[in-house]
Amino acid sequence: RADQVLDRLVASGNLTEEEVAGARTHPAEVLARGKDEGREYFVDWIAQQVEEKLPDTTGRIVVYTTLDLRRQRAGEEAVEHALAGMGKERNVSQGSLIALAPDGAVLAMVGGRSYVESQFNRATQAKRQPGSAFKPIVYLAALEAGYTPESPVTDEPVSMGGWSPRNASSRDWGTVNLTTALANSINTISVQVGNRIGIDRIVSTAERLGIEGPLPRNLSIVLGSSEVTLIELASAYTPFGNEGRRTEPYGITSIEAENGDTLYRHVPASEQVIKRE
């Protein structure tokens, strides 16, 4: 990783190959884990964006970000606590977390348990099946198709093409409304609803919320069989708490040159993807 940084410094013209030769010959000693290690995932993510926004910039710059240190510390502690508890019980060694403000500002980002052990950012790079976390998107599609929160739906066995999804518990829910079905994550009802409104509507809704896919064209999508990144899924949730408006996640508020000139400033932008009513 140190060599990659040195290569970038040479490529950008900030240093010559002769100037970095000593650093290559005598690399820095790796220090023990520090208190700020968890923030390095966010720093890496920001560094990539700086290169994309200002590819030809040379010299020193000052980057102002959205990171909230209090929330970042809380996020790191939450991930570690979860991995030490339930994670240990289920043999899960890694986890990630991202906290977004309604306007898309990234307030906290935890890409893994230890940046020293793994620089792979699981919050922005790892694609995982969201499972039941995908269901709010399905139920949004149902509401847009004419269902209401009080629409009655019945918990009954489902079998489609040899696929028979089951609920997490053996409880027979009987007939409940749509709100109760979502609140209790009832698989059988979710699949029935998805079948009635159609896969195309679900896929279209997911894409409108920012899920990039590829999304499966079968009913397993209802139970979260598609693969998404954590930042992608979190971003898809923002319209629910933002009066239906979607914003792209961002981590840089502004970039200044050493002399104070503004080189970049984030301009808030949003798109109405859900009707406010």
Question: What name fits each language-model region?
Answer:
Residues 1-73, 77, 105, 110, ...:
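Non-catalytic, structured segments within soluble enzyme domains
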Residues 4, 9, 75, 104, ...:
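Active-site SXXK
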Residues 5-6, 10, 29-37, 58-66, ...:
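Second-shell loop/turn segments in exported
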Residues 11-30, 89-100, 154-159, 250-261:
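Acidic/histidine-enriched alpha-helical segments
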Residues 34-38, 42, 48, 147-202, ...:
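Conserved catalytic neighborhood of penicillin-recognizing serine enzymes
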Residues 43, 93-97, 105-107, 177-179, ...:
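Short glycine-rich loop/turn motifs
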Residues 45-48, 99-113, 143-147, 158, ...:
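Glycine-rich, acidic and aromatic/proline-enriched surface loops and short helix-turn segments
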Residues 65-88, 97-99, 109, 114-120, ...:
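A penicillin-recognizing enzyme superfamily signal
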